[in-house]
Amino acid sequence: YYGVQTLAQLLALDKLPLAEVTDYPDVPYRGVVEGFYGAPWSQEARIRQLDFYGRNKMNVYIYGPKDDPYHRTPNWRKPYPAREGEELKVLVNRAKENNVIFYWAIHPGQDIRWNEEDRSLLLQKFESMYQLGVRGFAVFFDDISGEGTKADKQAELLNYIDDHFVKVKRDVAPLILCPTEYNKSWTDVEGGYLTTLGDKLNEGIKVMWTGDMVVATIDKSTLDFVNPLLKRKAYIWWNFPVSDYVQDHLLLGPVYG
């Protein structure tokens, strides 16, 4: 698939050069998180995005707009209404056409109860998304307070999902966690939150990290800090470009680094 994309790029030139194509990624997961606050993207915008990802060899799209009420509180326990479910199914199929893994994320932390009932409801929600064609799942515990922030409970839940859903299905991508302490400035090392996740989470679960701050350049020092705590390579959520904290204008500076 990616070789064809490279060929298409070469064919866009006036002349096709004599070339040998050796095409493989250095980074296994390359994509975009729709995980901002404010009006979510439209269906048409998402379709354009997925087509763009395919042309440019990006292979992951994570659906998690904060203002989707069925993604987080109050309705994360409920299935999508029929119309919204069909729209998501269209996106899932478009993602497959573009060789993109469509991840659907749930954000239950603000009102989750650490009991069997909520665990069962979460798995039922994931099953409903699986029936729509979703084959990638994420659990977000970012930007919350209270009971939902407990690292041991988060790890217990993620391991249960991994053992009783992801591994059972056999065709689902690795589970992703966005932790509560997802950047260095919010990390209480002595409190042991990240260490607990590193010790207790199943090995295959990916853990997100935004760098030294919420919006930050990703450099070696931040990875040297977090990777030993997580006992795995951090799954980078690079907050660029993001404008949800300055909604009166767009941030359109160049990519650098």
Segments (PLM) and residue ranges:
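Structural preference for beta-strand elements that scaffold enzyme active sites
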Residues: 29-33, 60-62, 99-103, 136-138, ...
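Short beta-alpha junction loops
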Residues: 67-72, 143-144, 182
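Catalytic-core regions of glycoside hydrolase
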Residues: 36, 125, 144-257
